[in-house]
Structures are given as structure tokens and as C-alpha cells.
């Protein structure tokens, strides 16, 4: 088995999908998790205005609405959370996403004060924090807020990780990578776009240039620029196609570098890192 084949197997990627079937599978998955854990009543998800949170949010709202209809339990709720750092430049996109999702509840938690307070504390301790590191602090603070909300509402936190992010490790460890349930896992970037099209989302939600937008000095930095490889190449690789040797090497290098993000904290019994 080649490394490409092994990665495809581990991430559960299909070369061809039926978007409607994948929507149904994700909704049923989200419903089944709450039904299996009757002490949980809500899903919580941060909404950025990009493709991934728009899709995960819509799937979550669909699952919750079906659960309420099937059980008669009005405690089932989906809570969408806006988590800007100060003023978000593309706030209009986030509002479009909320209009598409139509969440039961929408909260806004501005993380700027918490992030800046953490930076001041670190600087007082004698550390100078890089802009890149600050970006990861933002991502982790967003998850702190989401888990605080989930803790108060008997909830579980949804993550937006999908196959194209997972293979490259393009997420913050214990930040956006720290969630309870991943309804998009197995899907490539273009497959996620196909699901949004099937859900009749506004094209702006899936045609927008993907960006983590974590660094102050590189606002709106495109994912593909940061990764040095295009989502088309990543998706082709994950769907089993042949791509350029250079792109394949870069993707597989990201895979190896990001292995620690896919595991629980390393124990003496682990050998994947050796």
C-alpha cells in the first residue's frame, strides 16, 4: 500500500460522492451522537463566514430540528457563535452564513480582550510572542469560549475539520482542532462545496477564498499560499488521482509534520513519532 492509499484509507475519503447521501449521513451521525448521550442537549459551533463552518452549521441545525420533531424535546438546540477578534473585516460574510444556517441561537463573544490579556501576561513574564503564535492563541481562545458555552448548555462542540485540512495538519492543535465531533471528516474541500450547493447555499459561502485569517500582519492570508499547494491538488491527491511529484511531496511532508496533531498526547507506548 502506498502512502497515498494509506492516507485515503485513514481519512475515509471516497473518490466520488452523492452529496445528498453525504448530507443525510452527517445529519444522522449528529443525531445519533446526542441520542446516545441523553445528558447532551445542544451543539455549539463557531461561525466564521467561510465554507466549512457554514456547512457544519447547516448540518447541525438540520440535525437538531429533526431531533426536536422526532422526540418532542425542545431542549435540543443549536448554538452558533460568532468569535471575532475586535472587528472582523469580513463580518458581512459571517452574517450571510448565519442567514443560511438559521440557528436556534446566535451568540457573539469577542475574544480580543481575552487574547490581549493573555499576551500582556506572557509579556510580563518576559516572553515576546510572535504574530504566528498570537494567531494560535486566538484559535485556542475561540475553543475556550465554545467549551464554556457547551459546559453551560449541556452541549458538545462541533469541529469543522475535513480531509483536506486533516492531511495537511492545517489546524491549530487544541484550537480549532479541539472539538467533540467532526461531521465533515472524510470530505475533500470540493466535496464540501458540493454539499453546500445541494443545500442551495449562497455561492459566496463556497466561492470565497479559504483563509484561517489568524495573523495580524498577514490578514486574509489564503490557505493555499500558507500551504504552498492548492486545494485542487490536495483534493485530487485524496481522491486517488495522480498529481505532480512536487505537490505530492509537499502534501506528504505536511502529513508527516502534522502527525502529532492527530494523536492524543504521546505516551511511552506510542511509536508513530519515531
Curated annotation (Swiss-Prot):
SUPFAM superfamilies: Adenine nucleotide alpha hydrolases-like. The keyword Repressor does not apply. The keyword Ribosomal protein does not apply. Mg(2+) binds at residues 52, 165. Coiled coil: none annotated. Its EC number is 6.3.1.5. Pfam families: NAD_synthase (PF02540). Keywords: ATP-binding, Ligase, Magnesium, Metal-binding, NAD, Nucleotide-binding. InterPro entries: NAD/GMP_synthase, NAD_synthase, NH(3)-dep_NAD(+)_synth, Rossmann-like_a/b/a_fold. Deamido-NAD(+) binds at residues 140, 173, 180, 260-261. ATP binds at residues 46-53, 160, 189, 211. GO terms for cellular component: cytoplasm. It catalyses: deamido-NAD(+) + NH4(+) + ATP = AMP + diphosphate + NAD(+) + H(+). One of its GO terms (biological process) is NAD biosynthetic process. It comes from the Bacteria. Pathway: Cofactor biosynthesis; NAD(+) biosynthesis; NAD(+) from deamido-NAD(+) (ammonia route): step 1/1. One of its GO terms (molecular function) is NAD+ synthase activity. Homodimer. Catalyzes the ATP-dependent amidation of deamido-NAD to form NAD. Uses ammonia as a nitrogen source. Belongs to the NAD synthetase family. This is NH(3)-dependent NAD(+) synthetase. The lineage of its organism: Bacteria, Bacillati, Bacillota, Bacilli, Lactobacillales.
Amino acid at each position: 500500500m502506498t502512502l497515498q492509499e494509506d492516507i485515503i484509507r485513514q481519512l475515509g475519503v471516497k473518490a466520488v460522492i452523492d452529496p445528498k447521501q453525504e448530507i443525510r449521513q452527517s445529519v444522522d451521525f449528529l443525531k445519533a451522537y446526542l441520542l446516545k448521550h441523553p445528558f447532551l442537549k445542544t451543539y455549539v459551533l463557531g461561525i466564521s463566514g467561510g465554507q466549512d463552518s457554514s456547512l457544519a452549521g447547516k448540518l447541525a441545525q438540520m440535525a437538531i430540528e429533526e431531533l426536536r420533531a422526532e422526540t418532542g424535546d425542545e431542549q435540543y438546540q443549536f448554538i452558533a457563535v460568532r468569535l471575532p477578534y475586535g472587528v472582523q473585516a469580513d463580518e458581512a460574510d459571517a452574517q450571510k452564513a448565519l442567514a443560511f444556517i438559521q440557528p436556534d441561537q446566535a451568540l457573539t463573544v469577542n475574544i480580543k480582550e481575552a487574547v490581549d490579556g493573555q499576551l500582556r501576561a506572557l509579556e510580563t513574564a518576559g516572553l515576546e510572542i510572535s504574530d504566528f503564535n498570537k494567531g494560535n492563541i486566538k484559535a485556542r481562545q475561540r475553543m475556550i469560549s465554545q467549551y464554556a458555552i457547551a459546559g453551560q448548555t449541556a452541549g458538545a462542540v462541533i469541529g469543522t475539520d475535513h480531509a483536506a485540512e486533516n492531511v495537511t495538519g492545517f489546524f491549530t492543535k487544541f484550537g480549532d482542532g479541539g472539538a467533540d465531533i467532526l461531521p465533515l471528516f472524510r470530505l475533500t474541500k470540493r466535496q464540501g462545496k458540493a454539499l453546500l450547493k445541494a443545500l442551495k447555499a449562497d455561492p459566496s459561502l463556497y466561492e470565497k477564498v479559504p483563509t484561517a485569517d489568524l495573523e495580524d500582519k498577514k490578514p486574509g492570508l489564503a490557505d493555499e499560499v500558507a500551504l504552498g499547494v492548492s486545494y485542487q491538488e490536495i483534493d485530487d491527491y485524496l481522491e486517488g488521482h495522480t498529481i505532480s511529484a512536487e505537490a505530492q511531496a509537499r502534501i506528504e511532508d505536511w502529513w508527516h509534520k502534522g502527525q502529532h496533531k492527530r494523536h492524543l498526547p504521546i505516551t511511552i507506548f506510542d511509536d508513530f513519532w519515531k
